[in-house]
UniProtKB/Swiss-Prot annotation:
This is Chaperonin GroEL. PANTHER family: 60 KDA HEAT SHOCK PROTEIN, MITOCHONDRIAL. GO terms for molecular function: ATP binding; ATP-dependent protein folding chaperone; isomerase activity; unfolded protein binding. One of its GO terms (cellular component) is cytoplasm. The gene is groEL. It comes from Clostridium botulinum (strain Alaska E43 / Type E3). Its EC number is 5.6.1.7. Keywords: ATP-binding, Chaperone, Cytoplasm, Isomerase, Nucleotide-binding. Belongs to the chaperonin (HSP60) family. Forms a cylinder of 14 subunits composed of two heptameric rings stacked back-to-back. Interacts with the co-chaperonin GroES. It comes from the Bacteria.
């Protein structure tokens, strides 16, 4: 297919138009007085959002060169979202500023390769300084502040802080759509997996249709149980103890299931059977997790263990087990705390090593189930449009909170970038064009605060000068239009988000400046449809 070519200044300017179109759309959402953007959807109602990466993903431009520029900046937002989960608008804005300032210098004859070296030096110094002013997150209040700033909603901040307090920093917090109007928090303590009882006759509470077992024994196996003779020896031992039993197996069928149900209905003894969670290798790992949590042993053929030889000391134990139609929750497993700790360390190591997002998510879920539990934030709203917007805000706030716990917090509202300018300005280089790269970053670091001020309807330059001349940590509260100590006022950003936004913006922008030619496909014009009846002469 034939291609179009553009060179030098012409190519860079065309791509810059695309960068500006995308960044100008995204940056209106920045700060407490930022607005929303409406995204048209092929199916369903339009999406109203202030999430930078969601907006960037929707933008495709008609002109191929402009689109190239837009796609490069889209990568900045996407990468920042992947690493930190928030800060995508800031990253896009910084990329636009670095490209704009950089192109001015390249047009004036500066060498883009040397400018790139200066940009890298300045960014490394800025990141080093950001880490110096970072403070660790201390307690529930700090977590609530980070989430509230990210979502621009104090109620959401409190909700996320409650969730993290209940399940711990390692716990899993999921976000679901609620059937009601309100947003609420639902916490499941202990190990939960999505398998319910194999027969409704096993339920102990017929009104709620769930089985609750107090201090039960737990038999864990990866085998199918069809013949009651296989588990008869262990059942006899349990009946003598007067305890209840939970069986987790690949399947329970036929005679075995019938016998268990009949004994339950007669009141001889209570036993609930559930299918093992997961599939394939993941199932083996999950069964091992349950065994370690409850202090039991997995009865597996490959380990040479037979169901007929099972003794009481091979069974797991827990304070209570609750089984519904779809879920099983094991609360306070009586496993050895040291073994549980070792298992958690092992899963953490696997998370570090894996490159698959799906595997990482599943490992994180397993980690949470061992470490504390799962919290579900159920998001409610009056309309579907509001629900989607609210859900995106909560997702961003949750990501920001996790980032804050990981690397700490810095003064928010663009203040951290202003605070590091002094140190970056002191960098020097013998090469003039490298010096220009440093100056480009110095100028670009002002941009987030300038945009926050602009979105609040005030002149950014005045605000920037005032913050520069104030002590470190003092910034501009755009919501109330006054200068405050940002951390004391609860206006904070996660260090990881602030750092990632700058690093990703500089990475793509510095490479953008080195462009000398652009190659694009010639757009194909669709041939016009022939008029009806053409070429059909003489036909009736």
């Amino acid at each position: 297919m034939a291609k179009m070519l553009k060179f030098g200044e012409d190519a860079r300017r065309s791509m810059q138009v695309g960068v500006d179109k995308l960044a100008d759309t995204v940056k209106v959402t920045l700060g407490p007085k930022g607005r929303n953007v409406v995204l048209d959807k092929k199916f369903g109602s339009p999406l109203i959002t202030n999430d930078g990466v969601s907006i960037a993903r929707e933008i495709e431009l008609e002109d191929p060169y402009e689109n190239m520029g837009a796609q490069l900046v889209k990568e900045v937002a996407t990468k920042t979202n992947d690493v930190a989960g928030d800060g995508t608008t800031t990253a896009t804005l910084l990329a636009q500023a670095i490209i704009r300032e950089g192109l001015k210098n390249v047009t004036a004859g500066a060498n883009p390769m040397l400018i790139r070296n200066g940009i890298r030096m300045a960014v490394d110094k800025a990141v080093e300084e950001i880490k110096k002013i970072s403070k660790p997150v201390e307690g529930k209040e700090d977590i609530a502040r980070v989430a509230a700033i990210s979502a621009a909603d104090e109620e959401i901040g409190k909700l996320i802080a409650d969730a993290m307090e209940k399940v711990g920093n390692e716990g899993v917090i999921t976000i679901e759509e609620s059937k009601s109007m309100g947003t609420e928090l639902d916490v499941v303590e202990g190990m939960q997996f999505d398998r319910g009882y194999v027969s409704p006759y096993m339920s102990t509470d017929t009104e709620k249709m769930e089985a609750v077992l107090d201090n039960p024994y737990i038999l864990i196996t990866d085998k199918k149980i069809g013949n009651i003779q296989e588990i008869l020896p262990i059942l006899e031992q349990i009946v003598q103890c007067g305890k209840k039993l939970l069986i987790i197996a690949e399947d329970i069928e036929g005679e075995a299931m019938a016998t268990l149900v009949v004994n339950k209905l007669r009141g001889t003894f209570t036993c609930v059977a559930v299918k093992a969670p997961g599939f394939g290798d993941r199932r083996k790992e999950m069964l091992q997790d349950i065994a370690i949590l409850t202090g039991g042993t997995v009865i597996a053929e490959e380990l040479g263990r037979d169901l007929k030889e099972v003794t009481l000391d091979m069974l797991g134990q827990a304070e209570s087990v609750k089984v519904s139609k779809d879920n099983t929750v094991v609360v306070n497993g009586k496993g050895n705390p040291e073994n549980i700790k070792d298992r958690i360390s092992q899963i953490k190591a696997q998370i570090e090593e894996t490159s698959s997002e799906f595997d990482k998510e599943k490992l994180q879920e397993r980690l949470a189930k061992l470490a504390g539990g799962v919290a579900v934030i159920k998001v409610g709203a009056a309309t579907e449009t509001e629900l989607k917007e609210r859900k995106l805000r909560i997702e961003d706030a949750l990501a920001a909170t996790k980032a804050a716990v990981e690397e700490g917090i810095v003064p928010g509202g663009g203040t951290a970038y202003i605070n590091v300018i002094n140190a970056v300005e002191k960098l020097t280089s013998d090469v003039q064009d490298t010096e220009l790269g440093i100056k480009i970053i110095v100028k670009s670091l002002e941009e987030p605060l300038r945009q926050i001020a602009s979105n609040a309807g005030v002149e950014g330059s005045v605000i920037i000068e005032k913050v520069k001349n104030s002590e470190v940590g003092t910034g501009y509260d755009a919501l109330y239009g006054k200068y405050v100590n940002m951390i004391k006022s609860g206006i904070v950003d996660p260090t990881k988000v602030t750092r990632s936004a700058l690093q990703n913006a500089a990475s793509v922008s510095a490479t953008f400046l080195t462009t000398e030619a652009a190659v694009a496909e010639i757009p194909q014009k669709e041939p016009a449809m022939p008029a009806p009846g053409m070429g059909m002469d003489g036909m009736y």
